[in-house]
């Protein structure tokens, strides 16, 4: 009986994993002039309507949970490279909306990329619970398989783009897969311990609320498991990473990116760090500059097939 139960549990687990990424619903939506104009600056609005794009709300499976997300597909072109975007925020906080998804990612879609994003489990309309780098990492990984059902998607060319908390999901995903051709992380959480020391309320707030068992145990290992600074050597070395950081970021101090860059250097992980003097958490003051760097980074590795330079110290 014991072995039968183990076999049954294995079958259930295998079945759930096999379903990961299955696309359940894909519903087209439209960005109206009136709604988007109220939510974005003039230059962003012009960018949004610059080229023809099809926007969709999606529902897909991740660990048997129904998870919501978005996808944007350029109307022109075939066999397009893809970007998985990992949003900031947690649960319902800073969720993507029809307009904000389009606003944040229009610059990539207008450059010929399909962009797909998860709301993460536990957000409004999605099942499960956001664990801030726990099971929700599978919500990101599952999108690799969801892309197989997206029209025009070339799944041999996938990049990943995370912002703020989205850095946790991005870096953890890069410890599990090596098929991501390039990654970009902006204003990223990279050391939850030093971040907690800087923002005291994280300990009793975000960490205790979202990370299973942390509120009761205060076990710092739970924070280290979610901090790229502590698992940098496990991140695939086949994915070059672009780090973007502002020096005036109140939410994520520049020391997070600087110390992570040092760690990446030590483990010989391919990366580039760009620091924007006076840049805040969104880097809105440097919008055009950082977006140009992001496009160039993805173009290099997803379009041009560039190989990262040799990192070995030599003459």
Q: What is the role of each PLM region?
A:
Residues 78-80, 85-128, 192-193:
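Short substrate-entry loop that stabilizes the transition state in hydrolases
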Residues 250-256:
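Conserved alpha/beta-hydrolase "acid-adjacent" motif
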């Amino acid at each position: 009986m014991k072995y039968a139960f183990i076999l049954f549990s294995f079958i259930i687990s295998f079945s759930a994993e096999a379903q990961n990424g299955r696309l359940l619903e894909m519903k087209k939506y439209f960005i109206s002039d009136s709604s988007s104009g109220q939510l974005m600056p003039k230059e962003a609005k012009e960018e949004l309507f610059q080229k023809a794009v099809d926007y969709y709300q999606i529902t897909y499976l991740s660990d048997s949970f129904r998870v919501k997300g978005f996808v944007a597909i350029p109307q022109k072109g075939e066999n397009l490279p893809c970007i998985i975007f990992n949003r900031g925020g947690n649960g319902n906080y800073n969720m993507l909306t029809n307009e904000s998804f389009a606003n944040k990612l229009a610059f990539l879609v207008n450059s010929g990329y399909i962009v797909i994003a998860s709301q993460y489990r536990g957000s409004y309309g999605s099942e499960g619970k956001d664990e801030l780098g726990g099971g929700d990492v599978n919500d990101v990984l599952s999108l690799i398989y969801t892309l197989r059902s997206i029209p025009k998607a070339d799944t041999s060319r996938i990049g990943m783009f995370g912002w703020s908390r989205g850095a946790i999901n991005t870096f953890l995903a890069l410890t599990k897969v090596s098929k991501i051709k390039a990654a970009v992380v902006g204003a990223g959480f990279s050391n939850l311990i030093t971040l907690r020391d800087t923002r005291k309320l994280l300990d009793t707030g975000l960490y205790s609320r979202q990370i299973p068992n942390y509120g009761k145990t205060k076990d710092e290992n739970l924070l280290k498991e979610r901090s790229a600074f502590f698992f940098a050597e496990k991140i695939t070395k086949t994915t070059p990473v672009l780090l973007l950081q502002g020096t005036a970021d109140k939410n994520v101090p520049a020391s997070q990116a600087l110390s992570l860059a040092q760690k990446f250097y030590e483990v010989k992980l391919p990366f580039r760090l760009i620091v924007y003097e006076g840049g805040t958490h969104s880097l809105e003051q440097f919008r055009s500059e950082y977006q140009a760097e992001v496009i160039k980074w993805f173009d290099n590795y997803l379009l041009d097939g560039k190989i990262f330079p040799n990192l070995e110290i030599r003459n």
